[in-house]
Amino acid sequence: MEVKADSRYRFNRKKVRESVAKLLAEQNIKQKVELSLMVVGERKIRELEKKYFGEDKVTDVLSFPQMVGKRIPGDEAVLALGDVVVCYPQAKRQALKFNRLLDDEIEFLVNHGVLHLL
């Protein structure tokens, strides 16, 4: 899983990777997957929400399927899932609201996004 995040957005990347691996195993996904995670600010998530979903608002997580129901051409062993985008400031607010650790909230949002790709 590729993780892209500005260095100012601190979270436990290893924990997120392990959590996604566990989730995929629980969903009986045994082959390798291609999955990208982006952790962004409010401006970027608002831009994506408006461009792809027509709403001018900040949201916590977005999912973008790469190849619905298809494998990466030329590599039958890899399943192309797509991209998950998490809004760090929104995750931080939700962690406070629900009395959770920020790492736990980000993990929850990433897993939620991945489930939308399956």
Which sequence ranges carry the predicted segments?
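An acidic/histidine-cluster motif and surrounding catalytic segment
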Residues: 1-107, 115-118
